[in-house]
Structure formats: C-alpha cells, structure tokens
C-alpha cells in the first residue's frame, strides 16, 4: 500500500483518486470484501483498454490479483464490454489456467458482460448493473469502499489502473513518480484517432499538453 501511495498512481478511469489510499480505505472495512474491475470502456473513441488486454493480458491479471490480495477480496467481478468477445474468451482461458495451477486460491473470479451503456463508466452505476439492476448512479455517501457490490466493501478499478500495479512493484514507486509534467506524476495512455498522421494508443507523461 505504501508503495502505491508513494508512486502517485491514481485511478485512471476519470476520477483520479489515489490508488494506495483507496486500498487502505477498503482494507480497513469489515470482511468479506469484494473487488470490481470496469472494463466496459464505453467512452466514444476510447480503445486503450482493448489494446492492453489483447497485447499483455497477464500484466492486467497480475495487477488485479495483487490488488485483490492486498485488500483480501474474496471475489473479483470483471465487468467487460460486450463488444470485446475476443478479450472475454481469451481472459477466461487464462483464468482457467490460473485456477488449475492454484494461483488464485483465495479469490474467485467472475465475468459479467456490460451492455455498452456510457453511464456504467461511473462506478456506482456499474455496481447497479453488476447486481442485475438498471445502471443508474447511487447517492453518496456511503461510498463503494464502505457499501459497494452486494452491500459489501468493494475495491473498484479500471483496466489501466491495475495494469500499472505490477510494473510499479517491479521497478519501484520512484520510477513511476519520476515521470510526469506540469505538476503531475506517472504515465498515461491516450487513444488517438481521427484525421491524424499516427493514430493508435500512445503512452506519455501525465500532465502532457496536446501541443507537446
């Protein structure tokens, strides 16, 4: 947790809440605790999660399991975009291998398909959808770290956030925090498309401007 706090890693789904602090909040709550991953990627023109999941899925799975281990989550729910059947099929195959080798003995992993609703990018809307309800935002407080999925304390991350967890633990908090511009820390991934010379997924320092 301290390593995550020192790294400056924040939630990369839009809210930007400090990752280490979120882990600490969830871990302080009563058990059982849960975890939810938002892989719905419903924002127009965004495809960075698909890029990472198809090119380095193990890095995503390792980061997810590390986070689940830290907060002692009994179950992880992966909320995946329905338009990504290739990703879902491949991840299920890899998770089966994990289970066969007893690499996730303390954590059960579940898949749920999103319906592509943009609103479910908001964390509490995703929780409602996971529970089989209409994906509408909840009133806060209480926050998901206190009362989340099925009424249990829940750690919520998006794909890109957990993607950096393993890298930070391998290279250290200083490595990640040494990147960044204009008062920001870390690295960010951008989906570049449209009438540009070099479309695709681009990695750049946090805080970089369009001109730069």
Question: Where are the regions a protein language model picked out?
Answer:
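Glycine-rich phosphate/pyrophosphate-binding loop regions near the starts of catalytic domains
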Residues: 31-59
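Conserved phosphate/anionic-ligand binding catalytic regions in large, soluble enzymes, centered on
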Residues: 4-25, 116-128, 132-134
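Iron-sulfur (Fe-S) cluster-binding modules
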Residues: 1-6, 73-78, 107
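Hydrophobic alpha-helical positions that pack around
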Residues: 88-206
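Conserved alpha/beta core surface patches that mediate binding of polyanionic ligands
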Residues: 7, 12-30, 50-56, 170-175
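Short connector loops/turns at beta-strand edges and beta->alpha or beta->beta junctions
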Residues: 39-44, 69-73, 195
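Short amphipathic, charge-patterned alpha-helical segments
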Residues: 63-65, 207-212
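Histidine-anchored nucleotide/phosphate-binding helix
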Residues: 56-70
């Amino acid at each position: 947790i301290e390593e995550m706090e020192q790294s400056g890693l924040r939630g990369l789904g839009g809210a930007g809440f400090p990752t280490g602090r979120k882990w600490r909040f969830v871990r302080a709550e009563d058990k059982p605790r849960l975890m939810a991953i938002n892989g719905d990627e419903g924002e127009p023109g965004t495809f960075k999660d698909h890029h990472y999941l198809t090119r380095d899925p193990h890095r995503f799975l390792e980061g997810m399991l590390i986070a689940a281990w830290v907060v002692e989550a009994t179950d992880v729910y992966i909320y995946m975009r329905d338009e990504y059947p290739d990703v879902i099929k491949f991840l299920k195959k890899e998770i089966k291998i994990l289970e066969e080798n007893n690499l996730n003995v303390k954590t059960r992993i579940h898949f749920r398909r999103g319906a592509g609703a943009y609103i479910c990018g908001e964390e509490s809307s995703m929780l409602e959808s996971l529970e089989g309800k209409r994906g509408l935002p909840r009133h806060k407080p209480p926050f998901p770290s206190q009362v989340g999925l099925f009424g249990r304390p829940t750690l919520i991350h998006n794909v890109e956030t957990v993607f950096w967890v393993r890298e930070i633990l391998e290279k250290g908090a200083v490595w990640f925090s040494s990147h960044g511009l204009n008062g920001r820390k870390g690295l960010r991934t951008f989906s570049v498309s449209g009438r540009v010379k070099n479309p695709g997924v681009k990695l750049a320092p946090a805080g970089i401007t369009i001109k730069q």
